[in-house]
Amino acid sequence: MIKILLVEDDLGLSNSVFDFLDDFADVMQVFDGEEGLYEAESGVYDLILLDLMLPEKNGFQVLKELREKGITTPVLIMTAKESLDDKGHGFELGADDYLTKPFYLEELKMRIQALLKRSGKFNENTLTYGNIVVNLSTNTVKVEDTPVELLGKEFDLLVYFLQNQNVILPKTQIFDRLWGFDSDTTISVVEVYVSKVRKKLKGTTFAENLQTLRSVGYLLKDVQ
């Protein structure tokens, strides 16, 4: 499932956005700029929804520090600041989109989907890799029309690999994304689940193209 970081100090609006996106994304809510910056740096997210008028540290400062640290996660600013100067400043700092309040939740979702499509993280309801078809709506996997049962984190792991082809994925990044950096389990669980997915997809293009990078992580080559 898509992971979104929502940095918004208005509790009512934050909860409304959270509820509206609940069937589409896993949304992490934080309510001030310092906490937002910490989460954006330590977690793994597909998109950041960022208010500007935040306590502790304003949204412009958060965005500036993220980009200076090389964090390229798409950022959609949503704010009551509607002047052309504010919009220009946001884009100069590295924002990917800018939505002024008040807004329709439906429009917010459309903009989110557009940004995710642009970054390759969202492709309607299916992902295809060689002879594998993954349905994101039903959480099902088929290999040449034959169902293959991948449960829970197995399914999430496959989707994460397919969404990050030709990208070196450190074990720590996979662990933070799927289990959370504050999880009580150990990082060795990543190897366990990679082994499970490989076994269930034995003989597929995925199993052939998934490389283990010793002491680093994994790399899934794209389909040639």
Swiss-Prot record:
One of its GO terms (biological process) is establishment of competence for transformation. Residues 3-116 form the Response regulatory domain. Phosphorylated by CiaH. One of its GO terms (molecular function) is phosphorelay response regulator activity. The modification 4-aspartylphosphate is found at D51. Residues 124-222 bind DNA. Keywords: Competence, Cytoplasm, DNA-binding, Phosphoprotein, Transcription, Transcription regulation, Two-component regulatory system. One of its GO terms (cellular component) is cytosol. SUPFAM superfamilies: CheY-like. Signal peptide: none annotated. InterPro entries: CheY-like_superfamily, OmpR/PhoB-type_DNA-bd, Sig_transdc_resp-reg_receiver, WalR-like, WH-like_DNA-bd_sf. It is found in: Cytoplasm. It comes from the Bacteria. Member of the two-component regulatory system CiaH/CiaR. Involved in early steps of competence regulation and in penicillin susceptibility. PANTHER family: REGULATOR OF RPOS (PTHR48111:SF22). This is Transcriptional regulatory protein CiaR. The gene is ciaR.
